[in-house]
Amino acid sequence: MPPLPALAISAIVIAVALAAGAATSWLLAPHPSGAFARCATAEQLAPRHYAAPPPMCIDPAASYQATIRTTKGSFTVDLLARSAPRTVNNFIVLAEHGYFDQLHFFDNRSWVIQTGDPLGNGHGGPGYDLPPEPGASGGWAPGSLGMARFPDGRISGSQFFILKQAWPGGNPTVDYNRFGSVTRGLDVVGQLTSSDTIVSVQVKRT
């Protein structure tokens, strides 16, 4: 058999390396298990970028709790699956796939802090928007979690905010998808700044 041309050999080496890299990335990426084993994202188009919101995999009648570990410490969130099922489902699926890991709290104000943007500038997201869930609006006490809205009114698929204090002037004048409430560690939330990041998000069915 004659020797392969140098270019052909190089192409084979590159292909094998790329395949190995893809396999390694898949192995290192978090994979849902247990109660969330069937929670899958839509088709992944690029890192942290998907074709559509994830299909429903949670039970809206069940109770879910998230522990968000940050560089300042951890806090616990009760997720409002009954009033915001699609928003909670989206949050759980992204969390189970490690979407929020290492993302900065890029927008820090005296009364609110925001995260969930892979670009870290308020313009990024998972490639899709969420539908409004007005049943989850209202009750904006300190510790409330809501999905951010873009200036054109679209609801972000990944950016969310946490109230450190009461909403200035009372409740917001537009509807946000309120999907959770901090039940433990609100003092940690109050200490977060734009230099802090999410280390991990762990969700359990309670």
Regions found by a protein language model. Give the residues of each.
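Cyclophilin-like peptidyl-prolyl cis-trans isomerases
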Residues: M1-T206
